[in-house]
Design a protein with these regions (language model features):
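Soluble non-cytosolic domains of exported or imported proteins
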Residues: 21, 37-48, 69-76, 112-120, ...
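Disordered regulatory segments flanking catalytic cores
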Residues: 2-4, 13-28, 40, 214-320
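Active-site microenvironments of hydrolase-like enzyme catalytic domains
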Residues: 82-114, 129-170
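Active-site-proximal C-terminal subdomain of hydrolase catalytic domains
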Residues: 48, 134-233
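Catalytic-core regions built around general acid/base machinery
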Residues: 118-129
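Boundary/activation segment at the start of structured domains
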Residues: 13-94, 101-110, 116, 134, ...
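Sec-exported extracytoplasmic/periplasmic mature domains
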Residues: 32-35, 44, 48-60, 83-90, ...
Length: 320
């Protein structure tokens, strides 16, 4: 009972009025049904870390799954919050899902208090949302959500590589820590990207099982190219891929590396349109490099020079 009261107080302290459309980047934190008090405390701690980080970053925060006196189910509330989010196109939206998941070989579900939500249903709800999105599903059996929600505008993270990985997932604990962990900052730019946090969390998850002498039963994946396939941390050494994609295109990770919850000082000073243009140029350079073997050398070098000059001029004009 005491835990429930404390959770309600925390939820009320961050809950925004969903009837007001926020013009700021938004984070929706969904806390699923815990089942037992042990998981309730764990999920609460993970959620609190995300909430604290989002507030530090100045995000508009909405929490689903903590109200003790709600007049609607968590499923209804989640849909209402998503409907509201659709009214602010173009602004970053984070969706963090903390809890348990299930998979019956046909459909994956995220367990809520009351009726659950399936991957297919969530995909339908998100169709009107024209915003860059980062969706982090920390539940077991969460991989089918990556397939269902994949889109070029979205970065998707799941605790598991398949719906069959249904044991309790610990990835969420390490992800909630890594998102603001300076030791995860592999490129030393004084900010931890979503990609860097994913790599750190996935490796810490593997270390937990190894130290405990247990078989690794969860393999986190990240998709940011929109193909719904995703990559695992063991396909990279640091930020560098050690495998190639079958189609010759860059592996996932570039777009996720452009997502930062808490930005460094220089990035905070950049207008949104400048950051978006910079990210677009970086994407174009990466895609061009993947085509190096298929283009005439002169054409490749000419295109690369043009993009690099444009990026340098943009950074110089922004004072970087």
């Amino acid at each position: 009972m005491l835990l429930s009261i404390l959770f309600a107080l925390v939820a009320n302290s961050v809950r925004a009025d969903e009837t007001a459309v926020s013009t700021a980047p938004t984070m929706i934190v969904v806390v699923g049904a815990s089942g037992v008090e042990q998981f309730e405390a764990m999920f609460a701690e993970w959620a609190d870390r995300w909430i604290a980080a989002a507030q530090q970053a100045g995000l508009h925060v909405v929490v689903v799954g903590r109200d003790t006196d709600a007049t609607e189910s968590d499923r209804q509330r989640l849909r209402s919050v998503i409907d509201q989010a659709a009214k602010s196109p173009g602004i970053e939206l984070w969706l963090v899902m903390i809890g348990h998941g299930t998979f019956d070989r046909r459909e994956a579900r995220f367990n809520l208090r009351g009726p659950d939500v399936s991957a297919r249903e969530l995909a339908d709800w998100l169709k009107p949302v024209d915003r860059p999105m980062a969706i982090i599903n920390c539940a077991s059996a969460s991989a089918p959500f990556v397939t269902a929600l994949a889109s070029p505008k979205r970065v998707l993270i799941a605790s598991t590589k398949s719906g069959s990985e249904q044991n309790f997932a610990r990835f969420g604990e390490y992800m909630s820590q890594a998102i603001v962990d300076s030791t995860a900052d592999l490129d030393k730019d004084d900010q931890t990207s979503l990609w860097e946090a994913f790599l750190k969390a996935a490796r810490r998850t593997a270390e937990y099982y190894s130290t405990d002498g247990r078989l690794l039963t969860e393999h986190a994946v990240l998709d940011d190219t929109g193909d719904g396939q995703g990559v695992r941390s063991d396909q990279f050494r640091g930020l560098t891929p050690i495998e190639q994609s079958s189609d010759g295109q860059p592996l996932d990770g570039q777009r996720a590396h452009q997502w930062h919850l808490v930005r460094n000082v220089s990035d905070q000073a950049l207008p949104l349109e400048v950051r978006q243009k910079r990210d677009g140029l970086e994407d174009a350079i990466l895609k061009l490099k993947a085509q190096k073997k298929t283009l005439p050398p002169a054409e490749y070098l000419g295109q690369l020079e043009r993009l690099l000059v444009e990026l340098a001029e943009l950074n110089e004009s922004a004072g970087r």
